[in-house]
């Protein structure tokens, strides 16, 4: 129960060894002597064992864990403290002050902290205990990272295994904290399936508690799909793949990025190309009004409150629990397969209207159609003017960028973003923006900036990401006219050769040289062999 509550997943030995080696290398490269190593969520002590192999028996190894069973199983091997690391029991002062008084000086911290997003701590208690990053939506590992920085001695080093939510917009404050207060030595994105039965991508981050300088460098690494398969099947080690594929960037780039984005997939020699692509872009908020459709899942499954009759969606946990609290009146609603009903269907009836869900939106076209009942109490259909045509539709979920134009006035679900002109007198053909949003040039920017270059369980676009897409202003010249004509042709019937012809025009629009075009093409051709992105590949 404790493991589920705290989001604990114990660390495979091979991953622990990888993290320990990175920690040791960082200590050696920065001439730091490591005498004391702490794991603040020690669990079965896989990371402390790996650290001991890396640093030897002369170091002191200390663990802290809230799980008494785990403490009892490991206390003979290491000094293990049974307590809650984040909010120590019966402690009235700040957590960092308490632990600094109880522990020896800490040279290094190695950890795979809990990843749970469940709020098990009272926010006011966290604030009183000195935590500054526990705001909005956050995972529990954020608290461990902040505490680690406060516990380490100056120039001390921490190496953490954390989820890829580090790169999400919700963690902008965490990235700012790390990029301003530490020297980020390593960021290694490992992807999914690193942990058995955990469908979340993992990242290893190694930081040193020191003020970064203009010359501070970060070693960046992404474990490719093929290398991950090899590693998981026992054909290679993480450190071998790391040594083969790593590259180095200036940490100062992260500080300058919008949202302090950790764009680790952008190599230094690609920065110039990206600066060309991102120059002279539209101001999204001045050009478009952004919205999304009916607040309902793509399946359209809802339950009805037996007290007030309001329909509402439900989460997987609520289905497992068999109940939920009504968002309107607070009554308990039974949530079972028998009580759930579909209000989105594939077949229309007399009072249903057309609605597009995410899977209907493809590049340049809308495929298929669904239907929804339009007057169900409790469902937020949004202002009907939002759906008036014409409008650009962008699929929220899935690998890649899928954009189409709707001229029918159909509703959409919340998994489809809607873009309409902010100026009602704007007569720019939407096909122009359609072409650029579906282009490989913009997709290259997306891959390099946000790193969404392979399948994962829950890929999705956000408004914040979309509003960074580098879209050149419409000039109405010959190139723009040809772009619109070819995009219109693709809307009528997709043809790969037309798609490639259009792409060459768009590359010309962005002023890319032949070498720069080939760099983008190579990146497209290196994408995984997945149906979602195979159309983006090009012959050189």
Locations of the language-model features?
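SAM-dependent methyltransferase catalytic region
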Residues: 1-187, 192, 204-225
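S-adenosyl-L-methionine
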Residues: 1-11, 16, 20, 37, ...
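Intrinsically disordered, low-complexity coil segments
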Residues: 26-34, 91-101, 246-247, 266-275, ...
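Short, flexible, solvent-exposed loop/turn segments with mixed acidic/basic and small polar residues
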Residues: 27-28, 52-53, 282-285, 406-410, ...
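Short His-Asn-centered micro-motif
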Residues: 64-65, 83, 358, 394-396, ...
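Residue-level detector of functionally special positions within alpha-helical transmembrane segments
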Residues: 84, 112, 245-247, 252, ...
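Short, charged, surface-exposed secondary-structure boundary motifs
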Residues: 91, 197-198
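C-terminal substrate-recognition regions of SAM-dependent nucleic acid methyltransferases
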Residues: 153, 196-197, 203-393, 492, ...
């Amino acid at each position: 129960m404790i493991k589920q509550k705290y989001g604990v997943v114990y660390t495979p030995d091979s991953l622990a060894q990888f993290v320990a080696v990175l920690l040791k290398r960082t200590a050696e490269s920065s001439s730091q002597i490591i005498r004391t190593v702490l794991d603040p969520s020690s669990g079965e002590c896989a990371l402390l064992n790996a650290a001991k192999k890396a640093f030897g028996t002369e170091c002191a190894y200390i663990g802290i864990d809230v799980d008494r069973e785990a403490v009892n199983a490991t206390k003979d091997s290491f000094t293990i403290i049974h307590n809650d690391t984040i909010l120590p029991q019966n402690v009235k002062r700040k957590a960092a002050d308490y632990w600094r008084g109880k522990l020896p000086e800490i040279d290094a911290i190695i950890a795979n902290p809990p990843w749970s997003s469940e709020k098990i701590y009272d926010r006011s208690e966290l604030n009183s205990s000195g935590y500054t990053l526990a705001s909005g939506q956050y995972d529990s590992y954020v608290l461990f990272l902040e505490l680690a920085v406060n516990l380490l001695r100056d120039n001390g080093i921490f190496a953490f295994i954390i989820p890829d939510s580090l790169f999400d917009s919700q963690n902008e404050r965490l990235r700012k904290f790390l990029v301003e207060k530490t020297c980020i030595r390593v960021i290694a994105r490992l992807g999914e399936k690193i942990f058995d039965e955990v469908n979340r991508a993992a990242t290893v981050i190694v930081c040193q508690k020191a003020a970064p300088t203009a010359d501070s460098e970060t070693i960046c690494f992404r474990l490719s799909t093929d290398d991950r398969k090899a590693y998981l099947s026992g054909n290679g080690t993480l450190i071998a793949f790391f040594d083969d594929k790593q590259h180095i960037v200036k940490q100062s780039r992260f500080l300058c990025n919008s949202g302090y984005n950790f764009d680790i997939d952008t190599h230094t020699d690609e920065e110039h190309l990206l600066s060309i692509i991102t120059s002279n872009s539209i101001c999204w908020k001045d050009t478009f009004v952004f919205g999304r459709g009916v607040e309902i899942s793509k399946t359209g499954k809802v339950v009805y409150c037996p007290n007030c009759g309001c329909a509402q969606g439900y989460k997987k946990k609520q289905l497992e629990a068999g109940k939920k609290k009504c968002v309107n009146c607070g009554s308990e609603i039974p949530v079972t397969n028998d009580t759930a009903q579909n209000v989105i269907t594939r077949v229309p009836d007399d009072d249903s209207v057309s609605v597009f869900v995410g899977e209907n939106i493809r590049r340049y076209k809308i495929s298929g159609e669904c239907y929804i009942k339009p007057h169900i109490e409790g469902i937020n259909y949004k202002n009907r003017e939002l759906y008036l045509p014409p409008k650009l539709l962008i699929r929220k979920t899935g690998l890649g960028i899928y954009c189409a134009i709707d001229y029918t006035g159909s509703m959409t679900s919340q998994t489809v973003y809607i873009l309409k002109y902010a100026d009602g007198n704007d007569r720019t053909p939407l096909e122009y923006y359609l072409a650029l949003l579906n282009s490989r040039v913009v997709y290259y920017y997306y891959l390099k900036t946000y790193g969404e270059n392979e399948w994962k369980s829950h890929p999705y676009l956000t408004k914040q990401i979309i509003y960074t897409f580098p879209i050149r202003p419409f000039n109405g010249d010959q190139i723009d006219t040809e772009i619109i004509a070819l995009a219109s042709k693709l809307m009528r019937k997709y043809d790969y050769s037309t798609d490639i012809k259009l792409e060459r025009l768009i590359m010309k629009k962005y002023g890319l040289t032949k070498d720069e075009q080939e760099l983008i093409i190579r990146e497209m051709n290196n994408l995984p062999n997945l149906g979602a992105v195979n159309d983006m590949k090009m012959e050189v």
